[in-house]
Amino acid sequence: KAASEKSGKVLMIMRNNRYYGHSVFAKNYIESGKMGEIYCGRCGWIRRRGIPGRGGWFTTKAKSGGGPLIDLGVHMIDLAIWLMGNPTPVAVSGATYRKFADNEAQSDSVHAKFGSKQENGTFDVEDLAMGMIRFDNGAVLQLEFSWASNIDHETRFVELRGTKSGLTWEGDSGVKFFSEEQGQLTDLVPHCQAGDGHVANMRHFVDVVVNHVKPDFEPIQGIN
């Protein structure tokens, strides 16, 4: 951030989840006021078996900085807080676990095919992290991220609950809204084209550099 400000260059971070079609729809829905006050939520990316590059870069804290919290969590936390309107965190609590370092079960995750397995390598990061963030507006966000845990199947999600409606965002599957109309419970399932979040993010970056539009991502959001 300091280098960007000193040089006058544009700093943006790849936050591709923001650029899916259903993410944009959800953001516009929230900003229209249809969710009301968002006061709590959950987000996670949990795998049954999906440890990337066991023994190598991913599982060596001195190189990667951490396990699924820093690998997977950053993407879902960013999406959740962005949808919530970027409130400022004031307190965080959590716990981490390393229970599958010696588990050699086959991976069932298509998202875990990164890095090469290193025999007799290092595994000193967590394989599961859970926590909660409390924000300056009183809202809370629960977190859960794992490379390996005994669950049914891999899922990545954001759930937000507002005073007027709630939503569930699920990976490439889309977004659903839960509300009521005329005294009846209603579900809204918009048919959005997901698109390629990475491509859309890069197009926005080019637009920022070439046409000087305001960046969707601001460095302070990452710092928070």
Name every feature range the model reports, one short phrase each:
Residues 1, 6, 136, 204-224:
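C-terminal helix-rich "cap/oligomerization" subdomain common to oxidoreductases
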Residues 11-13, 42, 143, 169:
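Hydrophobic residues in well-ordered beta-strands that form the structural core
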Residues 169, 192-203, 217, 224:
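Active-site loop of classical SDR/Rossmann-like NAD(P)-dependent oxidoreductases
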Residues 7-10, 17-122:
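Predominantly a Rossmann-like dinucleotide-binding segment in NAD(P)-dependent oxidoreductases
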Residues 65-68, 118-119, 189-193, 211-220:
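Active-site rim elements
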Residues 21, 71, 155, 197-200, ...:
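Residue-level signal for the nucleotide or nucleotide-sugar donor/cofactor binding architecture
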